[in-house]
Amino acid sequence: MNKLSNVYLTIIVALVLLTSTKAFTNEFDWQSAKLHNYKANAKFSENEQLTITLNSSKGAAVTLRPRNDKTWDLSAYHGLKVSIKNISNARIMPLITLDAPNSEKWQEIDNSLYLEPQQSKTLLVYFYITAKDFAQRYPQYQKMNGGPNTQMIKWDGIDISNINKLSFSAINVRDYISAQGSYIVQHIEPFRYDQIFDNKKEIPFPFIDKYGQYLHGKYPGKLNSEHDFIEREQQELDDLKAHPGPDNRSKWGGWLSGPKQKATGNFYTKQIDGKWWFVDPDGHLFWSHGVTGVGYHGANTLIAGREHYFQDLPSKHSKYQDFYSKGRGTRFDFTKANLYRKFGKNWQETTNKRNHQRLKSWGLNTFANWSDPSGFALQQTPFTIAVHYKSRMLEEKMPDPWDKDFGPNITEELKNKQRHEHGDSPWNLGFFINNELHWMGPSSYATIISNAPADQPAKIYFVDALQKKYKTIAELNDTWQTKFSSFNDILSSRKKLKFSQFKEDATWFYQQMANKYYKTCRQAVKSVFPNHLYLGSRLHGDVNAMVLRAAEK
């Protein structure tokens, strides 16, 4: 594949709509849509094709909008079905996006797919709506993320009755996905689930069977009787025997024939020939390849108020009584009930053993984050431990590292992991603290810290640092172009300052925040588990250099 530089992507969009979609054509009139180019050139041809040329710059796109400031109502459908052919000599990744005018910037519907040269595929662009819209449209399906023949709920869903933009673009990954090439969108039509799946248009109640499955449909893998458990158990045992797992692996899943390192009895990291590796407790190089959430917790669903959804629920006084639970309403755990049906009274022990067998057979070697600690006790597969704790927050997804309880609460939670989740085990690869923190950037936290209350520990630290840097408030005001009467005035102010006003100081604070966070977390881990790894925080969104510099320390 050629290197990408100043290249162009040509997309030929054939707007071929079947006569069966006449209603959709009226709502979604492509020929009369307004064409907008962004770092691109596009035009309609006489044969109803739309030829688009995108340059390789990030963000290049062509959009279609309804004329006369109208919008398209697609609420009768569940998605778009798009037939695409790659007619270029390179791998490409078309991206189709829908937007609504009343949505936030981060709310949109999109989907994409890989296409090898000359390959044809059909892309399904599923429609997602917000929880509020779902509750209004489908009151018969309570507390669900989607029902039979409904759109699905997603946190960034949009109002599909009010679509004002359809965009065509491409995803560019250097040396893997080319931005140079052509593809044809051969056919576009809206669809409903009952048109493409084995779904009835009108769904009667109940719609969930005794095994927790969708009742009104046939599909591969569906359980039809108790005998299916016996049959599938034998099938899996035969498969595990035929595929015991990869050869040339240590008992930890490390690389037996690789360059041997020092055996320390615990996992550690080492840079070898310029590349960082895990090293297993016996000194073999280790590449962690795992899956999160290994265990037997799954389909624990609310029953109270929704009894009519379910067919043949067992009695609360039957042998399935342990799979009922209370709290915020009565619930039933179909996953555990089915494991009981399959493995009998020792289902927990058998399930844990089987999970280790499965991962090894599939070529995996790690019980990753949020896996069930009961599986760790068997000491057969390396695992990671997720650490969550209470703390005062600086932002919704960012703890305040200057909070007096920040470090102590992490330490206490680590001690709980030591007591209850086999934290001291040599099979413990390490600890993740927090999940997907929103680091954003200095400009975002400039607004957050300037608007924080006077008792926010991070703001107190920042103002103290400012007082040490600037001899007088007049000197600070001169630099920031502000009119604070004192440093205490900064502390009590809830005014959101512009990043440009105090860019240097805000950037310094951001770096200090990252340093403080990662240093405190690592110190907490090492204070309880001196021989185990701190694996970091897991990052959300774009990663900037300042956060990476702090994390790598």
Regions found by a protein language model. Give the residues of each.
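Bacterial N-terminal signal peptides
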Residues: T10-T19
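Active-site-adjacent substrate/metal-binding segments within catalytic domains
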Residues: Y214-A377, M393-D424, K495, F499, ...
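Bacterial N-terminal signal peptides that target proteins for export
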Residues: M1-T10
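Polysaccharide-binding and catalytic clefts of secreted carbohydrate-active enzymes
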Residues: P281, V291-T292, A299, G305-K345, ...
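Extracellular ligand-binding interfaces
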Residues: N55-K154, N162, A179-I184
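Extracellular glycan-recognition surfaces and repeat-rich motifs
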Residues: E27-I52
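Short beta-strand-plus-loop segments that form exposed binding edges in beta-rich domains
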Residues: F168-I177
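Extracellular beta-strand elements of beta-rich domains used
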Residues: L166, Q186-P190
